Amino acid sequence: MSSKRGGRSSLAKAPEEAVNGEAFAPEASPPPPGDDGDAGGEDGGAPAPPPPPATKGGPVAVGRSLEIQTTPDVCMEMLADKLKLLNYEADFCRKKKPYRKPLSRLYFAVPLANSSEQFFYFTSLATWLLGLAGVELPAPKEFDDPNLTCQNILGAVKKLGFAPPSYHPTKLTVGNGKEVVGVLDGLVDFVLERRHHKYSRPAYGNDGQPEEGVQLDDEAEAAAMEGADELAMPAQNQADDDEEEEGVYVDPGRGDAAGPGTGASAAMDAEKAVLVSKVDPTLWKIELERVAPKLRITIAADSKDWRSHLDEAHQHKEVISKAWPDSKTSLERLRADLNGTLEKLQTREKFLNEQFESLMQQYRAARTTFTDVQETYNRKTEAVADRNQEMHRIGETLEEVKAMMDEKGSNIADATPVARIKTAIKQLNKELHDMEVRIGVVSHTLLQLSLRNKRLLQAQAALSDEEED
């Protein structure tokens, strides 16, 4: 089920020949289902060797490619089947709410209307697969920077021993296409290999169908219909025929089957008694004549029928057999030329790897420095975002204080309360003046009354003195 992958870059191959002291072993492709007849000869062939075992302490293989050679739709169909082997529907789709829908067989192969949702599904699935592969990556968020998220995913994939892709990380931001399918397919293959998953040949059960190559021609169909017509014969005649056939197979050493003293004869008679039909032959024949036309099946000629395909296959086989001797020499010469060219390419590749080894080391150091600077930049960006949020919060508080000050200032600048206070003071002064006048009048009245009372008392005292004298 593994898809065909492109070779890695020639410059990136040699520096990554081994990880943790293990040499690179090319990925063994499992045999395609249904090809066990021709791949291994007449006996079905030996099963393909299993993929190399995974190493617990590091990457399984080095120099894997993230680029596919098949079309995205074909690779996506195989990717959906591989994800089912990892039980992603339970472990990924239904791990937390809201639940995700399982992938269709063309989800990442074609663009969808909601590209942001498609990209978020890709980043979440890639992060989950990286976690299964042993690389912890923070869970992506829906509104994260797409370019930064894609760079983080490719950086984590590179730690597993994958060769750097030839395309730019921004190709992954669209959320679909061969680049996205290639990344997911490579990660799924890596996880399956890490779990020591082995592909086995499919087991086909015997469903009672005729094997390929067996043709039911018109003569066989006619013979079958004749067999159906023979059922219309009387049951008694059939019983007689059975008796004749049984008479032929009588064992001479045991005597006649009808002779006395033989147990086989009694058992055979009992069997015959069971097999004798009690149906009226005439009614049987009438019923058969009524039902037989309904049981006849006429198979129309179809260009898509397997018989026509088999005939075409035989014709193609004959054409290939005739053309093979002439083309074999040309193919052998072409193979020799290709082998020579491959040897030259390998020699040239080794020379280039040795020549650019120092540049590759400088490139790795520059990439490491760039990664550190990028992380520092991300931290600074987060700090700036926090400061901006704090500045916005302080600005909102300042606006509220300004509004309160403006309200107080407007109240202070308003002269209406002062005028009211002055009017009230004048009214109070007037009332105080009136009260003082009234108090003076009352005091004068009291003074007069006290003087009058004093005179009366003096007069009474004088009268009382005179009376005493």
Curated annotation (Swiss-Prot):
Stretch list, region Disordered: 1-60, 233-264
InterPro entries per record: Intra-flagellar_transport_57
Record flagged with keyword Plastid: no
Complex and partners: Component of the IFT complex B, the core composed of IFT25, IFT27, IFT46, IFT52, IFT74, IFT81 and IFT88 as well as associated subunits IFT20, IFT57, IFT80 and IFT172.
Record's subcellular location: Cell projection, Cilium
The keyword Coiled coil appears for this protein: yes
Alphabetically ordered keywords of this record: Cell projection, Cilium, Coiled coil
PANTHER family: IFT57/HIPPI (PTHR16011), INTRAFLAGELLAR TRANSPORT PROTEIN 57 HOMOLOG (PTHR16011:SF0)
Coiled-coil ranges from the UniProt annotation: 326-440
Protein's name in the database: Intraflagellar transport protein 57
Annotated family: Belongs to the IFT57 family.
Biological role: Required for the maintenance and formation of cilia.
Assigned GO CC terms: ciliary basal body
Biased composition (Acidic residues): 239-248
Family annotation (Pfam families): IFT57 (PF10498)
Bilayer-crossing regions: none
